[in-house]
Amino acid sequence: MADGEDIQPLVCDNGTGMVKAGFAGDDAPRAVFPSIVGRPRHTGVMVGMGQKDAYVGDEAQSKRGIITLKYPIEHGIVSNWDDMRIWHHTFYNELRASPEEHPVLLTEAPLNPKANREKMTQIMIETFNVPAMYVAIQAVLSLYASGRTTGIVLDSGDGVSHTVPIYEGYALPHAILRLDLAGRDLTDGLMKILTEKSICHYTTAEREIVRDMKEKLAYVALDYEQELETAKRRSAVEKNYELPDGQVITIGAERFRCPQVLFQPSMIGMESAGIHETTYNSIMKCDVDIRKDLYGNIVLSGGSTMFPGIADRMSKEITALAPSSMKIKVVAPPERKYSDLWIGGSILASLSTFQQMWISKGEYDESGPSIVHRKCLLAG
């Protein structure tokens, strides 16, 4: 890699809901677009429109009435490799870069199956002819972006949540916990509440409207039961929301009922621990000597940790679970919605000490895709 130090690596973070991509060394991603691929429902329907066999991202979103939308990444893990033309779109259309000229840093969900990591490596080197690549765990990058190398990351995005303890830059795989509860479930839960109360009726195509409502109006109550009582007595929690057709609806207790599901999954019929207990359980799976460092560095990451009030509530809940003498600190970086882990990737790929960690094409040719498990150690 020594000869290519003036070439900026590409950093691509593929989330369940959004792709964030750009150049290492930049302080924000150049491209942020939905992780969706759409294919025409009927060939020939779009005559005269220069019909493509597939549309990606915002273009797919805008044509959603006449194409079938697919999310190739489910619960943070690639489930449909045919639809990963998202990478082609990212490099050539969004970044206007030739991947054969740039090293590429990809991100992956914690506990990503080994076969998936190998497939990502193979596609990058054999299909895109990249000179070098690396796969890093998303939560590790979020921690780097917060200026830490030790801590526990609660990463909750659109499709999945994880708690990932990290010690001196390395994820501790035995203590990573996954929770199949995230933003999409909260949006669906809010749709259900609104429909039950006949506030409005939605189909999947209009899920985007409810997602927007959730992002603009939902918040986490410090004390859920007390907030319910307050909502019954006073209209202070009520807010108006204007639908695209101009109709105005009022939502009250739904604003904090929606994200309460993160702490109480039983509200939507899920038998699992909430995000606070999952964080605590992850810490308890770690060596007793490092727990203090983890309790003092709980870092929130991902769009589903953006609700006002979530950091205070996490702090309160974990304080109740932890030993009484333990100092608890919950950190909520302001850029965590889209770009914190992308920034972590940008920092990592720019470090001079990282340059010998890339998997080069030569190493791949010698060892095959399994080299990813030997070289990508920061990926847990």
Curated annotation (Swiss-Prot):
Superkingdom of source: Eukaryota
Subcellular locations according to the entry: Cytoplasm, Cytoskeleton
Record keywords: ATP-binding, Cytoplasm, Cytoskeleton, Hydrolase, Nucleotide-binding
Record CDD domains: ASKHA_NBD_actin
Reaction it catalyzes: ATP + H2O = ADP + phosphate + H(+)
Keyword Amino-acid biosynthesis tagged: no
Protein purpose: Actins are highly conserved proteins that are involved in various types of cell motility and are ubiquitously expressed in all eukaryotic cells. Essential component of cell cytoskeleton; plays an important role in cytoplasmic streaming, cell shape determination, cell division, organelle movement and extension growth.
Family named by the database record: Belongs to the actin family.
Name of the molecule in the record: Actin-1
Organism: Daucus carota
